[in-house]
Amino acid sequence: MSSNLFSLKGKTILISGSAGGIGNATAHLCVNLGARVILTDIRQEALKDTFNSLPDFQEREPLYFAADLTNSDELAALVDFCPQIDGLVCNAGVMKLTLTQFIKEEELIRIQKINLNAPILLTKSLLKKKKINKGGSIVYTASAAGVFRVSIGNGIYASTKCGIDAFMRTIALELGSKGIRCNSVNPGMVETALIGSFTEEEKANEIKNYPLGRFAKPEDIAYGIAYLLSEAAAFVTGTALKIDGGMTLS
């Protein structure tokens, strides 16, 4: 173990949704903290760009594997490709604002598959194949939405993020005896493509809810993820870590 408890030196970490946003920032931070990373995302070219942008440390060469985690065959192929890991970051997610009366079943199913089913099934498959080392750490990107705050039209997204937090707490109980910790980060609004559909007026109105006067940068969330992956969080499990700039205070 490093004398710096926040170091990730010697750890191998699988990061889903790593082609952009929070996943990209997490990949860069983990490498800079000494980890070897395995990147996965459905967007092959963007994933390759992330891979190529990482620092070149030959002794801990990163790996990448493009996969649609809602496809059982591709998920299985990723798990087979993956070496033994010390950390898992489930970060892939999508969002669509829709009033309840206008929800389309196909959209409901699509968002549930990506935000809820995929991280659960990836976790299950890695555990079944005994790919997560004792003393490992699992971190899910959940949300303040639904868990700590609700908003009109956000029922589908919020319900999936509530679901992933409930799953996180359940497996924290299940895996504690194996020394595997399970936590989540719960951001508010983050400056990523996920909020690209918001108008400037909508963003200006929303930012009034943030005491710190801005939305999060992807790096702000990555810092929390890296903490939960590190030995500094060795006694932290079953925790939903709010990183929301004080948004849920109001």
Task: Kindly label every feature range from the protein language model.
Residues 123, 160, 168:
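Active-site helix of classical SDR
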Residues 176, 181, 236-238:
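Short, small/polar-rich loop/turn modules that mediate ligand/substrate recognition or access, typified
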Residues 19-21:
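Conserved glycine-rich cofactor-binding loop
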Residues 103, 149-158, 170, 198:
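Active-site loop-to-helix junction immediately N-terminal to the catalytic Tyr of the SDR YXXXK motif
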Residues 94, 101-120, 139, 157, ...:
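Catalytic Tyr-X3-Lys loop
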Residues 143:
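Residue(s) in the substrate-gating loop at a strand-loop-helix junction
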Residues 2-4, 148, 226, 237-250:
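Short C-terminal tail/terminal secondary-structure segment
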